[in-house]
Amino acid sequence: MGSACEAGTDEPSRDDVKGTGNGILENGHSHKSEEEEWRNGMGEDLPNGHSTPPEPQQTDEQKEHQVRIVRWERFLPVKTLRVLLVENDDSTRQVVSALLRKCCYEVIPAENGLHAWQCLEDLQNHIDLVLTEVVMPRLSGIGLLSKITSHKICKDIPVIMMSSNDSMGTVFKCLSKGAVDFLVKPIRKNELKNLWQHVWRRCHSSSGSGSESGIRTQKCTKPKVDDEYENNSGSNNDNEDDDDNDEDDDDLSVGHNARDGSDNGSGTQSSWTKRAVEIDSPQQMSPDQPSDLPDSTCAQVIHPTSEICSNRWLPTANKRSGKKHKENNDDSMGKYLEIGAPRNSSMEYQSSPREMSVNPTEKQHETLMPQSKTTRETDSRNTQNEPTTQTVDLISSIARSTDDKQVVRINNAPDCSSKVPDGNDKNRDSLIDMTSEELGLKRLKTTGSATEIHDERNILKRSDLSAFTRYHTTVASNQGGAGFGGSCSPQDNSSEALKTDSNCKVKSNSDAAEIKQGSNGSSNNNDMGSSTKNAITKPSSNRGKVISPSAVKATQHTSAFHPVQRQTSPANVVGKDKVDEGIANGVNVGHPVDVQNSFMQHHHHVHYYVHVMTQQQQQPSIERGSSDAQCGSSNVFDPPIEGHAANYSVNGSFSGGHNGNNGQRGPSTAPNVGRPNMETVNGIVDENGAGGGNGSGSGSGNDLYQNGVCYREAALNKFRQKRKVRNFGKKVRYQSRKRLAEQRPRIRGQFVRQSGQEDQAGQDEDR
């Protein structure tokens, strides 16, 4: 169906075709005068664009053939396609030209890209298709493709690339530049037969709904396409700066779309060009869709600046101010992302999404039109840089409501006096924690001193949370100000332990996240940003309160706290009284906790067997005093833990090795109060680097470790002895076979015995 000579049985015979007078002569060519007249658009008065001589009579069979031929020419009016073949190799060019002529194409050969471009510039050639090689001297195929796509007239000509290099990079580059297809050499005849489909798609798409003359419709509609392209590019350029580079880019993208946007059947070019135009073109947004300002760079990439969406509703005189406002928004966005606080516009909380316009800056543009340029800039900076009072009131009300629920929730806890600094610290804690809980990890820029803001930034960057903390036990006691959460419950009773084992009444607003998560029975994945703020900024407050030694003694039995790496603080001094005072100071930095009650409750939950075993085996070491306070509980109260230094795996695995090491280390643990304590999750690292946590709670961890080492060494020695014996036997056997091979002759690869005496002598030697 590609040409007249390939019509097959669907076409009438040559005599019938000649009789119908459609201008189709033998050999599939038409009169030159008729073809030129048809290309110049002179035959528009005729139905097919051809000269039809009148016939006096026509039979019904001839009318059917005529209708069939008219329908065929409606879709492909060109009788023979002219193909510009660009190939630098002479033999390849001749072979491909012969194949194209066999497929009834007219071939115009070109040796290189420059010659091909000269042929394209000559409009008398009427080239319908370009088949070019990728790699050529002077002007390559990709360079020729770029020239064709950028030309106003030649951009409608389909370009097919061919090359022996079929790498993905080459194909991707050619298709992205505007090629409609890519053929891999050697080229087959069947591939060349189907080249007409690209021209048919182009003519059919440009002619609208399948008009009778596709090329004439294309010539008529090309100025319309250019006008639409200019309008679209003009509207797009209003959104951007008036730079020549931007206009050129828009020209290329829209030009590709005007030429190849309708190649729905090929699936090659339209997929590349449509995306660029869809991204650049403004799309009207519905008023119901909320258009909040993006708070992340990912959102900025996915959603283009909302200014583009509002240009259809804004006057043209106001678009320049929109650009300035966009730059100010970008500056403020970078500034607030740097310090960890979001930029909040005045419209973000005041109006609902249905009441908001399509663009948050639209109302500001409408109200600020009469004002001067500097006034608009200063107003936009003020609205973007400072949180409004309505926002602060909203967050404060949320914090107060959550705090009331928290107080009602823990009203059964023992009455412990909690002295929390009031004023700006409390407001800052409530604002930051509630924004992190309700508004999704957003930090507000509050009015505080420079040192407090600096500490907050450090906290944000220094979170010790990991992906596995949510699977451990929930923090039962207070976590807000003390910098630790003593885990007083096993893993299976997280929500129950929160109700029964919480022993302090927290007055800080920073415990809202803990109460909310604890009530759901979830883990202690809380906001680490504000939980240790008081412990960091004021580490030496409330130093006078001391916990009784019985509480410290309980810590030795239960090991309820997770050991952490210790940092030196003024409260930690070597000695019995100083250690107790340091523990008390660590607890009283934030909120005092009744440690003895919580430890004893937890003792009955989990570590009863550990308590019994340690009473029998480790009673002398427990009564030694403060030297045993180093068993992992005194280190918990350091402020830089950031609120999750509790023992998250209180299932007995840590406590057994813990108490086992205390008996061996003895007084040597007291000097470790003032230096970093190297403790692991499962036990204490001894001086020789061996961890002693065995989890059984019976006996010393180091004893079992030494027994295991001895057992392994014995097994290794036994294995080595066996290997020596086995290798010795192999060595002897190999030497005897070598000697036998030298003594015995071979026939066809087999040993042949010479005499029985030699065999007997060889056997004696082997023995």
From Swiss-Prot:
Residues 205-214, 518-531 have a biased composition (Low complexity). Residues 263-272, 343-361, 488-497, 532-543 have a biased composition (Polar residues). Keywords: Biological rhythms, Nucleus, Transcription, Transcription regulation, Two-component regulatory system. The keyword Transcription regulation applies. Residues 727-738 have a biased composition (Basic residues). The keyword RNA-binding does not apply. Disulfide bonds: none annotated. Gene3D superfamilies: 3.40.50.2300. It is found in: Nucleus. Residues 712-754 form the CCT domain. One of its GO terms (biological process) is cytokinin-activated signaling pathway. Residues 82-200 form the Response regulatory domain. CDD domains: psREC_PRR. Residues 238-252 have a biased composition (Acidic residues). Induction: Expressed with a circadian rhythm showing a broad peak in the middle day. Transmembrane segments: none annotated. Residues 1-64, 205-272, 312-388, 476-546, 646-701, 727-767 are annotated as: Disordered. PROSITE patterns: CCT (PS51017), RESPONSE_REGULATORY (PS50110). GO terms for cellular component: nucleus. Coiled coil: none annotated. Residues 689-700 have a biased composition (Gly residues). Belongs to the ARR-like family. Controls photoperiodic flowering response. Seems to be one of the component of the circadian clock. Expression of several members of the ARR-like family is controlled by circadian rhythm. The particular coordinated sequential expression of PRR73, PRR37, PRR95, PRR59 and PPR1 result to circadian waves that may be at the basis of the endogenous circadian clock. This is Two-component response regulator-like PRR73. It comes from Oryza sativa subsp. indica (Rice).
